[in-house]
């Protein structure tokens, strides 16, 4: 659990997302309130519920990215889902309780990885012993084993192929799903693969190089040192206390008052979400999960529907409203220059792997931002995602010929951008299809 202050959280989000100050402040306060709640006494702690958030804004302005970065900062179980993927209970499709089951699955995987790291040193020693035994043979003398161990540590045996007996993690039930219930495994709540594991599981013999075998052996030896019940208990606590669920496209299940049609399950999805967001208990294969203190962040563009078209009860369960504004040309310039994961840095690094040096000049960056903003304005506003399309088009020729141009320096200025994009950006009909 992160103990960052709201100011520190916003500062960290600023490294990856430009603008949207109100949304950043809202999620920062929501995260800090979790830390505050943990400082309270037992009598009051259960009474403090998270203030769920509704983000309203066009596509590509940072709604999803804010939530994803927040989850990483909080080191919390996180799940992003689309509201349109779910149907009302009784109809063919996934019901909303699957959200919590998927969140629990993600939490167990994260918790297991974290606990593996804690026992990695001991697991590494056991893995090394198994590799030495495979190299020297089971009945080898201690002196021979030590000789192989020394060579192993010096990396002299990395390419040598050995045969090992490993746990078979593939589940014969993995691909069996209930017809019409995507993502719902055959066997319902029964974890058949876990049942097989309890009886020792299946082991297979595999031939691997010494270097390849280490990661598999360390993971297997670490799992032997872990208590499965402790992993599940820690994961379920993380879900219940720190879980974050991001529900995208919530506006697509908001039925407009004047709308007519056969989409009967839209309002039903909203009704099914009510108890989940309010607080209920969901059965998972790891045990029951209470959703009372899971933070729900819903988002939507609300181009056609309005937030007031949501069920009044659902509106009441999303008390914090945040509007995200559309991005401007100046925002695009900042996105290309100020963020830690800026596209300019990414393309420079990608071309450097081919020995090509790429230099972005300020007027080139401004030209990219201008064209992205113009196309957004004239065709369809898809926010920062337009930059991906524009830059990919500019670099199309260079990306193809880069292996033949090793040692060259390419300067991306306004003329370079104009040469590769000028005609397309000026022709609305063409940009509608190409950009």
From Swiss-Prot:
Family in the record: Belongs to the ClpX chaperone family. HslU subfamily.
Residues that bind ATP: 18, 60-65, 248, 313, 385
Keyword Chaperone in annotation: yes
Gene Ontology BP annotations: protein unfolding; proteolysis involved in protein catabolic process
Primary subcellular site in the record, as a coarse category: cytoplasm
Xref: SUPFAM superfamilies: P-loop containing nucleoside triphosphate hydrolases
Record Gene3D superfamilies: 1.10.8.60, P-loop containing nucleotide triphosphate hydrolases
Protein name (Swiss-Prot/TrEMBL): ATP-dependent protease ATPase subunit HslU
Quaternary assembly: A double ring-shaped homohexamer of HslV is capped on each side by a ring-shaped HslU homohexamer. The assembly of the HslU/HslV complex is dependent on binding of ATP.
GO CC annotation terms, alphabetical: HslUV protease complex
Pfam families, alphabetized: AAA (PF00004), AAA_2 (PF07724)
The keyword Nucleotide-binding appears for this protein: yes
Protein task: ATPase subunit of a proteasome-like degradation complex; this subunit has chaperone activity. The binding of ATP and its subsequent hydrolysis by HslU are essential for unfolding of protein substrates subsequently hydrolyzed by HslV. HslU recognizes the N-terminal part of its protein substrates and unfolds these before they are guided to HslV for hydrolysis.
NCBIfam families reported in the protein's UniProt record: hslU (TIGR00390), PRK05201.1 (NF003544)
